[in-house]
Amino acid sequence: MLKASYLAGTAFTKSYVGYVHAVAHSLGGRYGIAHGLANAVLLPIVLREYGASVYGKLARLARLTGISSAASDKEAAESFIEHIQKMNDDMKIPGTLQGIRKEDIPTLAAYADHEANPLYPVPVLWNAGELERIYHLVQEEQKRDRTGNQTDFGKAA
């Protein structure tokens, strides 16, 4: 178990999930949203927001896993992120988390910023103000949710 825990920690540290985890922790702490659900909803959003800074590594993953053979790193990376979104859709994981109060967002972002910086290695450094955008995107993803599913505080609708 110790070795498995170490390997999991190493994987998390090297996989750019720092902001995903930090935001998920703040949502779980404030609203009781299930950590796994929050992570699943946040991952494609945060990867999209990282933009070009992660194209090379995500493109490599896309090619290694057979998700994309696109010559362009941008195209391959976008295919990889889209594949994550499709897996979420297939598992009926919503594209949004309802119940996040706008007045809480600055405090939540400050908590996430404090946790993620400098504890997690991330491809792009964001401050609390920039992290607020992620919370707003989590609410706005409903417009792009292909499953029609939503959640209220982490409970299936």
Per-range role (PLM):
Residues 1-86:
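Active-site segments that bind and position negatively charged phosphate/pyrophosphate groups
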Residues 58, 68-157:
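C-terminal charged capping/lid subdomain of soluble metabolic enzymes
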